[in-house]
């Protein structure tokens, strides 16, 4: 006896199943073979009993609702139901029709065993056959009549054989032989189904192979993810490096362009603005020391080197009335043009006029306030009266010209201190300052001329410009004029008064206070430094002492040097 049959017997005893229920449980067991025809015939005979019928049908419906793993219980229960419908009581077919929905649900029965085979296909096919049989009344009647005839024949054959043989038990071969055609057909179907299952069963692989396959797949996936992350990181770093290189290249190109622009672009030199409207001076290649601009429009001249070793003067203030700083020369408001270079003209006399030569290059200055390089008036009148910001210079009043920009278009006419504009012999104005007593700036040129060597060429060392003084204009006859009286600042002259004229008849009455006549004898007076230095003739006695405004005075003057040779006679009236 098998283990499954022993377990069924134990359950039958425990649950106290009836004889009919035990037979149904035996016919619908989980064994791999189908129910025997004799057992099914006995159950069909019990269906005619009302009590046994209810027990049989309740157990069959219980087997039909079993779990998927007990698919054999379901399949054998449907086989037993079909047999009972054909050979059992009519109440079986009637109850099956009433509970047809329970059979119809089995059309969707699903179960796949561990080997991957679908075992629910047999249940689904059997359910379709039962539903079709229950719905077709004619077929049901025919099948039922045929099954009953077959059962009767089998019963008669069995009775005759049993009577002939005797009361001995039939052999085992006869017990295994199907008792009816239905049972034989059922066994044949079961055998075919089982053989088909065994043929369709694929070779199963061991669990170790599945584990190794899953492990290999997971390792391959991890390696792929790692390589993808590394590739993305490399792409990101490469992109950042390319952007950084582009930024550095752009910065280098911009800096190179700026360097080239700085190299090839020369900044424009600052141009000194002329407050009197004079033309801007042409810049030269020779560097000139920083000096105050000439307020009267005189061209700037680089100072020459001092042959006596004097300290290089520094630029002075442009105010003609304020004393200059002790460390540099003062700006001459009457400053002449620069001396010509070597080989271009004679060297000017340091004690004479500085307008003997004109600059070689550049247009002449059209400043109305600058002295002309040569004045043809034998009476010595100055071309114009200099003024500073509308104030009187040297004690003579002049009104500022509002059309100073147009003065360069007309010729400057000599004027005198009188309102009538008469030409006077000595009516020309003199600068408010006389050269300093110790100013030896012009000695270098005269010494170079006397020795016969050309003056030193212009060097970057700044030298003071050549000054034009009344003594240089008058020459040796400067003693005929009282320079101190002319330089001093007398009170304002009335507009209607005339300046003194030495050629005016003695009988003509003066119209107002006149300036002191230099030709009239005067009481003796103290000699001034200018008279001691420049006058070869004793000064006119009786001249009152006057204030001398030094142009370069103050501390830090160069040491006193012996005067140079007297300048040649330039007065056309002296024979």
UniProtKB/Swiss-Prot annotation:
Gene Ontology terms: cellular component: clathrin-coated pit; cytoplasm; nucleus; plasma membrane
Signal sequence region: none
SUPFAM superfamilies the record matches: ENTH/VHS domain
A GO BP annotation: in utero embryonic development
Record-listed Omega-N-methylarginine modification sites: 533
Modified residues (Phosphothreonine): 420, 459, 463, 469, 493
Stretches assigned to the UIM domain: 183-202, 208-227, 233-252
Biological role stated in the UniProt entry: Binds to membranes enriched in phosphatidylinositol 4,5-bisphosphate (PtdIns(4,5)P2). Modifies membrane curvature and facilitates the formation of clathrin-coated invaginations. Regulates receptor-mediated endocytosis.
Similarity section: Belongs to the epsin family.
Protein name: Epsin-1
Species in which this protein is naturally found: Mus musculus
